[in-house]
Amino acid sequence: MNNDELATRRAQAIAENRCFSKGRLRDEFRMKPAPGAEPVKWYKNTYGDRFAVYRIADCVPMREKRPLTSKQLLAGQRLSVLSRLNSTSGRMARQAYDWLSLAPLFLDTETTGLDNTTEALEIGLTNASGQVVFETRLKPTVAIGAQAAAVHGISEQALCGAPLWTDVARQLRHAIGGRPVIIFNARFDIRILKQTAAAHRDPADWLEEMTVYCAMELAAGYYGVTNRYGTISLASAASQAGLTWEGLAHSAVADARMTAGVVNAIAAYHPSLMLMYAYISINEG
């Protein structure tokens, strides 16, 4: 609304001797009660709170806001960027960025089920770029549950010639080395690896010594939880990151790659904010 339209609207309301609350005076007429103006009447809103209405003829125009200076605009932008850096999403992005600076590996397993006898039957390990570092199938000592088979499509027949855990554990440990490992739902996959080792009477103490980060907790913090468990699925996180699957979903390597993609997508938010902050700081100086 331009100044002429606003003046016409004010004049019409004054001529009609209309009354308004402070909120409507401000929003519709850019006016406020004059010093000493008394309310015409008091009302209650739906919450039981009282509010006053004033005769518009007893009101005065509000002072026009001055345009912000370039310094004020930059200061506002700087505060906005700082707010985003300190938000949950900003902190999760910084965390992901810090993880990637450690040259982590990304691990995923496919399993025989979900319970405390479940074992891994496929392990995939990639780097942050999605390159395969280690990949194997395993012959478990327990049967594959029907629900698990329906998810990953791996049959017991397909594992007839697969190695045992004891055949590949040393190779897996060597492939990981001392690098941190990022896993989507780390608690689950680490439990499965320990159960698999225990089924073969392998103490696998090195599993306890690994530095492990959970990408599911990271993604839930960044994108928000999406289920009744207070977490987020890899598929949902990938969708929100705008990623598409490389290979079949629910294969260990494909899921490890997708986990890497999600972490990279989250991490990318941090340098973009830092670049904005640096630009503002330079121009403020």
Give each language-model segment a name.
Residues 19, 23, 62-102:
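N-terminal accessory regions of nucleic-acid-interacting proteins
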Residues 35-50, 163-166, 248-258:
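Short linear loop/turn motifs
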Residues 39-79:
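Short helix-start
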Residues 101-106, 116-121, 126-154, 174-285:
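Metal-dependent phosphoesterase core characteristic of DEDDh/y 3'-5' exonuclease domains
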